[in-house]
Amino acid sequence: MSLEPFKHSEALTFGVELELQLVNRHDYDLAPFAPDLLRALRGTQHAGDIKPEISPSMIEISTGICHDYAQALEELSVMRDLMVNASRGLNLGICGGGTHPFQVWSDRTISDSPRYQYISELYGYLAKQFTVFGQHVHIGCPSPDESLFLLHAIGRYVPHFIALAASSPYVQGVDTGFASARLNSVAAFPMSGRAPFVLTWDAFKAYFDKMRATGVIESMKDFYWDIRPKPEFGTIEVRVMDTPLTVQRACDIAAYIQALARYLLLSRPFMPQEDDYLVYTFNRFQACRFGLEGEYVHPNELTRMPIADHILSICDALEPHAEALGSLEALSNIRALAASRSNDAHWVRAANRDAHSLRDMVRQTCEQWGGG
């Protein structure tokens, strides 16, 4: 399959995808209820989409093309409420979080679709271990070249997105010490990491054609990059976030990314360069391991500061952009989150500490999702 033409899209429109956990109400382990839930939702009216994912213990909800924060919040809230109402008759719980805290990967099954079966055959047990849950945000770009500028410019802020959304400290019943352990599962795939540093669509197309000629990839879906262009939508897709515990936080983070994109496209505070990636992996690890308390190394100034402080410094620059986009409330929430140094990973650990039970903690995350 050749690289698709870059579709025209309205700049700075955005879309949000959330992968959600489906658990039974008996012991709060993952349960393969996606087909039952989708049948129960048949005929309901809502914007956006609700669809199956790689595991039948997972379901994805996604907005349509959103122009502002309020629209995304409304669309996701409606889908959340429909799903929660439908789940009651199925004895099913729905929750956010980047990993299920005690599920055993070998118990998982792979959804019966050609794409997912191909992934399972190609990657073996990695496909079952990929039962992790993320938030993806698409940002509309005015041109294909601008999409590559934005992809590499916004790459500096990947630690922000990871730390703000981090909600996956537990894996198979163990506290990993990470704020976001989910991304360790993604890193196992050979085409993960960062996109190649090219700034024109012609150069990107040449790279794609070479990779396809090797037989390593067939389409853009085979790249598991942290941020990737999506030519069929005319967007870039930011893919590093854990699924937050509430719709509210997911929308706050999406609006933050939208405001940051506007700032980068209109103000051009710097030009992306290859050296930006010298500290990329270190900064990414710090965000995964320590969340908002991790260290951020500035790629040009070579200074160090807490990730939370770097977020707060950028929020000042984003204020006029958030105002223009109608998302000052979201920016205020992001400021408060960064100032508190306390993300969803902190909440999950506290819930487990108080309940002395991972199962009860999952029950509480279901309540969080249903209420927020």
From Swiss-Prot:
SUPFAM superfamilies, sorted: Glutamine synthetase/guanido kinase
Keyword Cell inner membrane included in the entry's annotation: no
One annotated GO biological process: modified amino acid biosynthetic process
Enzyme class: ligase
Keywords: ATP-binding, Ligase, Nucleotide-binding
EC identifiers of the protein: 6.3.2.2
Molecular-function annotations in GO: ATP binding; glutamate-cysteine ligase activity
InterPro entries associated with the record: GCL_type2/YbdK_subfam, GCS2, Gln_synth/guanido_kin_cat_dom, YbdK
Catalyzed chemical reaction(s): L-cysteine + L-glutamate + ATP = gamma-L-glutamyl-L-cysteine + ADP + phosphate + H(+)
Domain of life: Bacteria
Recorded family membership: Belongs to the glutamate--cysteine ligase type 2 family. YbdK subfamily.
Stated role: ATP-dependent carboxylate-amine ligase which exhibits weak glutamate--cysteine ligase activity.
Name by which UniProt lists this protein: Putative glutamate--cysteine ligase 2
